């Protein structure tokens, strides 16, 4: 890999690792998210950094992503990366709780509905827990809308990049 590519990879890998260290140290037995701000921070470190990484790599390696396009992509690169993460958090609540001992639904959202992270899988708490998810659904929807805008800013000539972004 050329020196610029190595520097890009190093920069964003370090950002991700240092950020994730905070969550692992704070909750060594399983991640617990306190509030919506911390939810955003978690999503940034685990996925927003990937949005930056890809954007920087594409700018460096693709002749169709000039400075003007790059500037526009930077506006939405974090939600581009975070969209899949926010959707996966919503989709995998039970799996994360049972297998990873991780609760990404913020404590304050659950408390506002009369529930708690300890009751995330309790059938009796299901209505309260579902109500607590509404703000996270809005976050995911916003991330998806902004990620689509990100893809729209990619040049039509960047076919492989556009396909990478659109196809799982």
Each PLM stretch: what is its role?
Residues 1-83, 90, 94-168:
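Catalytic cores of Mg2+-dependent Asp-rich isoprenoid enzymes
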């Amino acid at each position: 890999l050329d020196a610029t590519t190595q520097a890009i990879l190093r920069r964003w890998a370090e950002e991700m690792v240092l950020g994730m260290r905070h969550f692992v140290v704070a909750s060594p037995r399983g991640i617990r998210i306190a509030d919506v701000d911390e939810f955003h921070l978690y999503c940034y470190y685990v996925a927003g950094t990937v949005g930056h990484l890809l954007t920087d790599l594409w700018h460096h390696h693709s002749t169709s992503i000039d400075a003007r396009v790059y500037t526009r992509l930077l506006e939405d690169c974090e939600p581009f990366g975070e969209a899949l993460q926010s959707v996966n958090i919503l989709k995998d609540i039970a799996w994360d709780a049972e297998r990873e001992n991780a609760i990404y639904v913020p404590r304050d959202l659950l408390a506002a509905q009369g529930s708690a992270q300890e009751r995330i899988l309790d059938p009796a708490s299901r209505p309260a827990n579902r109500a607590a998810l509404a703000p996270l659904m809005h976050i995911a929807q916003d991330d998806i809308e902004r990620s689509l805008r990100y893809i729209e800013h990619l040049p039509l000539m960047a076919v492989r990049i556009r396909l990478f972004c659109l196809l799982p």
